[in-house]
Amino acid sequence: ALRKATLPERSLDLILAGDLLNQCIGSFLASMHANVPYLGQYGACSTMAQGLALGGCLVESGAADRLLAAASSHFCSAERQYRFPLEYGGVRTPTAQWTVTGAGSCILKSLKKGICVARATVGRIVDLGVSDANNMGAAMAPAAAQTLECYLEDTKTSPEDYDMIITGDLGEVGSKSLYDLLERDGINIRKQHNDCGLMIFERSNQDVHAGGSGCGCAASVLCSKIMDDFQNGLVQNILFMATGALMSPTSSGQGANIPSIAHLVNLKIK
């Protein structure tokens, strides 16, 4: 991101970054040599939207002039930490998703024109009793539905007001669940919706089961495909909602429920 913006690291007032590893070790190892103030973020796969929402507030308030929001994930590390080491050779269920090895970062600064963080909704933690670490789409869909409904109610808008409604990594199972939950309340997003977990892989040629997941899934799709769509004039007003399954290696190993959360930011051209 800094290279694209032709900016040195010292131009940043703050780095907001997170990943899926214990103590966000990947993010702080990547940030430590920048010699820039750092705030670690953990929202599971919702981290990119969380960073954009928090970063937008910090820039708008004047607490930071320019900052970087980033998120990353790694397939093998996530499998070892939350499920089984690859050497174990466990069979993945059809509802399982493939953690993306990827990263994305955005630079936020107060400007008079360009792509802006217009609004944000911070999600609430939702627990509907799902405990299967191989079916996180089902665990996260209720949080996505709640956050989106809160946002639409607060802003008095409808799905038709937006060019796209992007979720982070609900995958195939979670996206269908989201449609069902919203349509019970009279909200239809099928025309506007897409999911980063369904976009990032070529699923006709790659066996990733229910799709992609991980902090890097939403971050890398947003910072590549979606930003390109903005630059090319294909979209001007979107909702980016990243969802996170709030589990730890301990809770996962004990078979505890998987609470979830979803944070939403409205990105638009101003």
Regions inferred by a protein language model and the residue ranges of each:
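Short glycine/threonine-rich loop-to-helix capping motif typified by GTGT followed
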Residues: 28-31, 170-185, 250-257
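Long, repeat-rich segments with strong aromatic
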Residues: 143, 149-181
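Short, well-ordered, mixed-charge alpha-helical segments that flank or form enzyme active sites
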Residues: 24-25, 75-80, 125-129, 174, ...
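Short, well-ordered amphipathic alpha-helical segments that serve as non-catalytic structural scaffolds
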Residues: 1-6, 54, 139-154, 221-226
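Short beta-strand segments
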Residues: 17-18, 67-73, 108, 238-243
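Conserved beta-ketoacyl condensing-enzyme motif
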Residues: 1-46, 161-176
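Condensing-enzyme catalytic core mediating Claisen C-C bond formation in acyl metabolism
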Residues: 85-150, 154-157, 187-208, 234, ...
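Active-site-proximal alpha-helical scaffold in enzymes
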Residues: 42-69, 108, 213-234
